[in-house]
Curated annotation (Swiss-Prot):
It is found in: Cytoplasm. InterPro entries: AAA+_ATPase, ATP-dep_Clp_protease_ClpX, ATPase_AAA_core, Clp_ATPase_C, HslU, P-loop_NTPase. This is ATP-dependent protease ATPase subunit HslU. ATP binds at residues 18, 60-65, 256, 321, 393. GO terms for biological process: protein unfolding; proteolysis involved in protein catabolic process. GO terms for cellular component: HslUV protease complex. ATPase subunit of a proteasome-like degradation complex; this subunit has chaperone activity. The binding of ATP and its subsequent hydrolysis by HslU are essential for unfolding of protein substrates subsequently hydrolyzed by HslV. HslU recognizes the N-terminal part of its protein substrates and unfolds these before they are guided to HslV for hydrolysis. The keyword Cytoplasm applies. Keywords: ATP-binding, Chaperone, Cytoplasm, Nucleotide-binding. A double ring-shaped homohexamer of HslV is capped on each side by a ring-shaped HslU homohexamer. The assembly of the HslU/HslV complex is dependent on binding of ATP. GO terms for molecular function: ATP binding; ATP hydrolysis activity; peptidase activity; proteasome-activating activity. CDD domains: RecA-like_HslU. It comes from the Bacteria.
């Protein structure tokens, strides 16, 4: 679990997301409250439940990006789902309980990686011994069993030294490695994912722990042996329990496009993919127990963050019970021309940095001037105003159009330097931006 303070979390998010300070503060406080809760005594800790968040804002302003970056910072089980993929229980489609099952699966993977990393030092020692056994087979007794020697031989010590110094990396050896499990791919019908994953696990375990001799270079063998030995040191039962605890105490679920499951107008008949899904989400958000293949998971202390554009529907169109379970409302603002300028220059891997790096692979040096950046931002904002407002995503379409000629001819421009200023941008984009019909279809 992350121990970062709210200020540190916001500072980290600022490296990738421009503006939206209120949303950043809310998720930073929610993330820090997970840590604060774990410092309480057990009785009080059980009573403190997370305050779920509803993020409201037009498309392309950073809602999903906040979720993506939060997943990396959280160091906790995290899953992002689309609300539109689910249907009410009993109908064809995924049911909402699969959110918790997927969250538990991601926690199992996360805890396994952590356990393997924890045991890496011991695994490296054991892998080294297996490679030395392949290079200098130990003496055998009358029954064909390897004899245990009190002291390693001088030859073994000499090979160990060479192995650690990397002198034997390219030497080929034959070692026995665990055979890869039998791959059985089963296409799951909607709503049957849990059963098919259990069938796959059963088929994979049929092969047992067979070993297969393989010829490999020592450096490649070392990597595979370390993974194999580290996996042996992991206790599957402890791993499952640790993963379930991590989900129950620190799990975070991000539900995107929640506005798309609002009921629209008067409609007769069952609303299985809208209001029905909202009703199914209620027990998950409120707290219930979900059965997974790894064990029972309680959702009482899982943090839910929902987001939606709410351009057609309003937050009040959600059923009242669900509104009450999302007490913290955060409104994200539409982006301005100044925001677009900052998006093009400030983030760590901004779009302009990416284009410069891509063209540098062909030996072309691209330079974006301040006037050029400003003109690109103005063009993107103008197209958003006259057609559909898709937020910062418009910058990608505008830049792709602007860079089309350079990208196409890059291999012939090796060693050249190209400056993208206001004049260059106007020459390539003004006609498209001015003509609403063209910009609607091209930009």
């Amino acid at each position: 679990m992350s121990e970062m303070t709210p200020r540190e979390i916001v500072s980290e998010l600022n490296k990738h997301i421009i503006g939206q300070d209120n949303a950043k503060r809310s998720v930073a406080i929610a993330l820090r409250n997970r840590w604060r809760r774990m410092q309480l005594n057990e009785e009080l800790r059980h009573e403190v439940t997370p305050k779920n968040i509803l993020m409201i804002g037009p498309t392309g302003v950073g809602k999903t990006e906040i979720a993506r970056r939060l997943a990396k910072l959280a160091n906790a089980p995290f899953i992002k789902v689309e609300a539109t993929k689910f249907t009410e229980v009993g109908y064809v489609g995924k049911e909402v309980d699969s959110i918790i099952r997927d969250l538990t699966d991601s926690a199992i993977k996360m805890v396994r990686v952590q356990s393997i990393e924890k045991n890496r030092y011991r695994a490296e020692e054991m892998a080294e011994e297996r490679i030395l056994d392949a290079l200098i087979p130990p003496a055998k007794n009358n029954w064909g069993q390897a004899e245990q020697q009190q002291e390693p031989s001088a030859a073994r010590q000499a090979f160990r030294k060479k192995l650690r110094e990397g002198q034997l990396d390219d030497k080929e050896i034959e070692i026995n490695l665990a055979a890869a499990p039998m791959g059985v791919e089963i296409m799951a019908p909607p709503g049957m994912e849990e059963m098919t994953s259990q069938l796959q696990s059963m088929f994979q375990n049929l092969g047992g722990q067979k070993q297969k001799p393989r010829k490999l270079k020592i450096k490649d063998a070392m990597k595979l042996l370390i993974e194999e030995e580290a996996a042996k040191l992991v206790n599957p039962e402890e791993l499952k329990q640790e993963a379930i605890d991590a989900v129950e105490q620190h799990g975070i679920v991000f539900i995107d496009e929640i506005d798309k499951i609002c009921k629209r107008g008067e409609s007769s008949g069952p609303d299985v993919s809208r209001e029905g899904v909202q009703r199914d989400l209620l027990p998950l958000v409120e707290g219930c127990t979900v059965s997974t293949k790894h064990g029972m998971v309680k959702t009482d202390h899982i943090l839910f963050i929902a987001s939606g554009a709410f351009q057609v529907a309003k937050p009040s169109d959600l059923i009242p019970e669900l509104q009450g379970r999302l007490p913290i409302r955060v409104e994200l603002k539409a982006l301005t021309t100044e925001d677009f300028e900052r998006i093009l220059t400030e983030p760590n891997a901004s779009v302009t940095v990416q284009y410069k790096a891509l063209m540098a692979t062909e030996g072309v040096d691209i330079e974006f001037t301040e006037s050029g950046i400003k003109r690109i931002a103005e063009a993107a904002w103008q197209v958003n105003e006259t057609t559909e407002n898709i937020g910062a995503r418009r910058l990608h379409t505008v830049l792709e159009r602007l860079m089309e000629d350079i990208s196409y001819d890059a291999s012939d421009l090796n060693g050249q330097s190209i400056t993208i200023d206001a004049e260059y941008v106007s020459k390539h984009l003004d006609a498209l931006v001015a003509d609403e019909d063209l910009s609607r279809f091209i930009l």
